[in-house]
Amino acid sequence: MAVYKIVELGDRILKERAKEVPKINQNIIKLLDNMAETMYHARGVGLAAPQIGVSKRVIVVDVGEGLLEMINPVITSCAGHETDSEGCLSIPGIVGDVTRASVIEVKGLDRRGKPLEVKAKGYLARALQHEIDHLDGILFIEKAKNIRKLVPKED
């Protein structure tokens, strides 16, 4: 496995709609493995393939409930609204308040090509929406209010 450099704000791939994955092969499996390793190395809770320069509809998320991998994810339903602070590995040091659905259902494929349906609420729902936005070329700062620099805590 490998840790990839995370693409940052200003790279045009972050503004493009990622391409559907027509077939799951060894390259996609390797991509999933490398994305997870990159996400954990960066201490993130989610990563979309465009964030490592790959235009594929692939995401990985781990909000402390275990690794969730999704290929070609689609949000099929949303309910409620919550506003909370978000940041992004591609926009280091910046946070903002984003309103998102509080409960969602997402359909996609797992690494074996089997259908996967996830019902998520709270932080997992927020992380999934954030990563799926990346697949559509949308950055959190486009939806955020009260955008601010993250001030490091002093020890």
UniProtKB/Swiss-Prot annotation:
Co-factor(s): Fe(2+)
Active site: E131
One function term, GO molecular function aspect: metal ion binding
Residues reported to bind Fe cation: C88, H130, H134
EC number: 3.5.1.88
Alphabetical UniProt keywords: Hydrolase, Iron, Metal-binding, Protein biosynthesis
GO BP: co-translational protein modification; translation
CDD domains: Pep_deformylase
Pfam families with a match to the protein in the record: Pep_deformylase (PF01327)
Cofactor comment text: Binds 1 Fe(2+) ion.
Gene3D superfamilies on file: Peptide deformylase
Reactions catalysed: N-terminal N-formyl-L-methionyl-[peptide] + H2O = N-terminal L-methionyl-[peptide] + formate
InterPro entries referenced in this protein's UniProt entry, alphabetically: Peptide_deformylase, Peptide_deformylase_sf
Entry annotated with the keyword ATP-binding: no
HAMAP family for the chain: Pep_deformylase (MF_00163)
General function of this protein: Removes the formyl group from the N-terminal Met of newly synthesized proteins. Requires at least a dipeptide for an efficient rate of reaction. N-terminal L-methionine is a prerequisite for activity but the enzyme has broad specificity at other positions.
Sequence similarity: Belongs to the polypeptide deformylase family.
Name this protein carries in UniProt: Peptide deformylase
Originating gene: def
